[in-house]
UniProtKB/Swiss-Prot annotation:
GO molecular function terms listed in the Swiss-Prot or TrEMBL record: syntaxin binding
Domain of life: Eukaryota
One of the protein's GO biological processes: lysosomal transport
Record localization: Golgi apparatus, trans-Golgi network
Coiled-coil ranges from the UniProt annotation: 61-87, 345-380
Entry keyword annotation includes Coiled coil: yes
Protein name: Vacuolar protein sorting-associated protein 51 homolog
Native source species: Caenorhabditis elegans
Primary localisation category: Golgi
UniProt keyword list: Coiled coil, Golgi apparatus
Known tissue expression: Ubiquitously expressed, with particularly strong expression in neuronal cells.
């Protein structure tokens, strides 16, 4: 029954197949079955057309072939008929000739034998010419073979003068051939095939094997040295050097080893000695070029060259057993990685110096945005460190062959050096640069004190955030853990913060010293005052203005609000010399070495301390009249009122101002102080425009 329903069988029943489909299939199933059958019929029709087309082409081809064969057979039949007629004619001629020459058969045989002898003699006499021709065509093997055969055959006739002359000429060509083979062996430009041919022929003719091997090794050594000389003289960079060595020196080395092993298998030690000497020379040249790199930007080129060199040396170890330069290559990889770390470290310091020089120029050009300058210094450091780490990551890339060495041979020490020798040392170099600016040696001695401030703020920001980020980034990128003996993060942060403290103190002290010197120069006494003071001296007012400007800069840089500049003095002014003497006994002790915090008030306080200390010491060096003391009192009152609003602790200003006034009172024989009510009036008055000589008389 199944064959009746199979469309591929001869007894297929259409009606039974349709009935079966109507019974088993739904309407959708019938539609789908119809589509499948239509598709199958179309495919079958297409296949039939394709088969017919292909068979038709084959039929045409076969027809052409049969026609061509038929034509060839027709031509062959004609040629065979012609050949048959020619053979019949030849057969007839041979029969006739046999009858004519039959009587002289013995004479003909004797004549043939004589001809052979004459022909042999002709070959003997032509031997030197033939050997010379083969020599000129560089068929040295044929020259040697023919001479040996001739020498053996003619040795019994060597007493014959003619034969002796032939042998002498042939021997001369033979010796020339032997010498030419030796020259070919000695020539460094000879290829491997020529060298092999020369060695084989020389050994075949019995040349001393040790002599031939020695000449071969000498020639090989010279060839390798020529390659080394060419490499040393002609290379653009380390990658070019390695590529050229891979194309010339190393293939030549491998070919020499292969040729020698084939010819002198039992004398390999001499070969290895020569090859090691030349490989040491190559390694020294490559190492010199690798370690002479001076630009950290070429790190990618260095890594590519190092990887290619490593792969070539690894291959040589298997191709030439006994020539293992892999340990030296691994040492070179470690040395080059350290060299690249040192280059990156040098570049970081150079970029930092350039960034600081740009900050100095910006401040000379009256740049006001100190915060942007501080951020610039920090960003220069962060960017350069991240760039250096990215370059060093090339040494551990997945496509770098030597990155897959055992960790204790390369990666472990390299990762440690990336953290300690690069990153930690970069922070050390940054700190050393801060020490240079703090010590003020050389040209740095005359820089704007604000450079120290900007530098200090950059270091402070670095220690608060970026330092931790960079250290963690390095440990993550190079798979390091604290158990690897790494420098603790807190140590690095502490070092940076210490330098920031030194720099900000340097800024405060230099700024205070500069302001104090300006104040003293403006207040230098030329003539004792002849009358009671009428206003605060201009130099004192300028000091307050400079202090307010400094306060504004610090506020913009460090944030926070400035104290109101018009705050009033909350303590009772000194009215008599006795009060001043009594207050001086209870003056607050001023500590000039307190830690400076990175805020406006703390820094301003240190500046004010330095200025007032200079002011006090200058007063102690003078002798005052009654009016001079009054002028000092007015100036002190003004300083107390204006500076107390800026510092973090008003007691500091009050105490130091009291010391200044007390010192002036001690330097006067008959001191009289201005009444407190008049002090306020004098401080409120604007500076008077007086002639310079009169203004000078207000000094003390």
């Amino acid at each position: 029954m199944s064959s009746v329903l199979d469309v591929t069988k001869p007894d297929f029943d259409v009606e039974a197949f349709v009935v079966k489909l109507l019974r088993e299939k739904s309407l959708d199933g019938l539609v789908k079955e119809e589509e499948e059958m239509v598709s199958a019929v179309r495919r079958l029709d297409s296949d039939v057309h394709q088969i017919v087309y292909e068979n038709y082409n084959k039929f045409l081809t076969a027809t052409n072939t049969v026609r061509k064969i038929q034509d060839e057979f027709t031509q062959l039949d004609s040629e065979m008929k012609s050949l048959s007629r020619s053979m019949s004619t030849i057969s007839t001629l041979i029969g006739n000739l046999d009858g004519v020459l039959g009587e002289k058969r013995d004479d003909i045989l004797q004549l043939g034998s004589s001809y052979k002898v004459v022909n042999s003699l002709k070959h003997i006499f032509d031997l030197p010419h033939v050997l010379r021709s083969e020599f000129d065509e560089r068929n040295y093997g044929e020259v040697l073979r023919m001479f040996k055969l001739a020498e053996e055959s003619l040795s019994q006739y060597k007493d014959v003068p003619t034969v002796q002359l032939v042998l002498q000429k042939s021997k001369k060509i033979y010796d020339m051939t032997e010498n030419q083979l030796m020259d070919q062996l000695r020539n460094p430009a000879s290829g491997a095939e020529l060298v092999s041919e020369a060695v084989d022929l020389l050994l075949t003719i019995g040349r001393d094997e040790d002599e031939v091997q020695k000449v071969l090794l000498t020639c090989s050594e010279q060839s390798l040295r020529v390659d080394l000389k060419e490499l040393s003289a002609n290379h653009s960079d380390v990658l070019d050097l390695v590529d050229k060595a891979s194309e010339s020196f190393i293939p030549n080395l491998t070919l020499i080893a292969t040729t020698h092993d084939r010819l002198f298998e039992d004398k390999r030690e001499d070969l290895i000695t020569v090859l090691k000497t030349e490989m040491n020379s190559l390694h020294a040249l490559v190492s010199k070029v690798f370690l002479s790199s001076s630009d950290a930007k070429d790190c990618s080129i260095v890594v590519r060259a190092l990887d290619r060199y490593f792969r070539k040396i690894s291959t040589c170890r298997y191709v030439i057993p006994g020539l293992d330069f892999l340990p030296l290559t691994i040492e070179l990889i470690n040395a080059v990685s350290k060299h690249e770390i040192d280059l990156s470290l040098t570049r970081i310091k150079e970029e930092l110096k350039n960034g600081l020089n740009e900050v100095r120029k910006a401040l000379i050009n009256e740049e006001k945005d100190l915060s942007a300058l501080a951020s610039k210094i920090e960003q220069v450091f962060v960017h350069q460190v991240k760039t250096a780490l990215a370059n060093l990551l090339l040494f551990t890339a997945s496509d770098v062959t030597f990155a897959n060495l055992p960790p204790d041979e390369f990666r472990q020490s390299f990762s440690f050096n990336a953290h300690e020798r690069l990153l930690v040392q970069a922070f050390h170099r940054f700190s050393e640069l801060a020490d240079e600016y703090e010590s003020g040696a050389g040209e740095i001695r005359f820089v704007d004190p604000r450079v120290h401030l900007v530098f200090a703020v950059a270091l402070q920001h670095l220690s608060n955030k970026s330092a931790v980020y960079l250290l963690n980034l390095c440990r993550e990128q190079f798979s390091l853990s604290p158990d690897d003996g790494l420098t603790d993060i807190t140590v690095v942060m502490s070092e940076v913060k210490t330098r920031a403290q030194k720099l900000v103190r340097c800024y405060a002290e230099k700024t205070g010293l500069s302001m104090g010197e300006t104040l003293i120069k403006g207040c230098a006494m030329l003539v004792q005052p002849a009358a009671t003071p009428s206003a605060v001296r201009a130099s004192v007012r300028r000091l307050v203005e400079e202090m307010n400007t400094c306060d504004s800069e610090l506020t913009l840089l460090l944030g926070g609000d400035s104290k109101p500049k018009d705050s009033r003095v909350s303590r009772r002014p000194i009215t008599t010399a006795l009060d001043a003497a009594r207050d001086s006994l209870w003056c607050e002790r001023i500590d000039f070495h307190l830690q400076i915090h990175f805020n406006r008030a703390s820094i301003i306080t240190v500046i004010v301390k330095v200025v007032l200390k200079i002011f006090i010491e200058s007063i102690r060096l003078q002798t005052y009249s009654k009016f001079g003391v009054e002028q000092v009192q007015v100036d002190c009152y003004y300083l107390q009122r204006c500076l107390a609003a800026l510092v973090s602790d008003e007691v500091v200003v009050n105490s130091m101002v009291d010391q200044a006034l007390s010192s002036a009172l001690k330097r006067c024989q008959d001191p009289v102080l201005v009444h407190p009510s008049r002090l306020a009036q004098l401080c409120e008055q604007p500076p008077a425009n007086r002639p310079s000589s009169q203004a000078s008389s207000l000094g003390y």
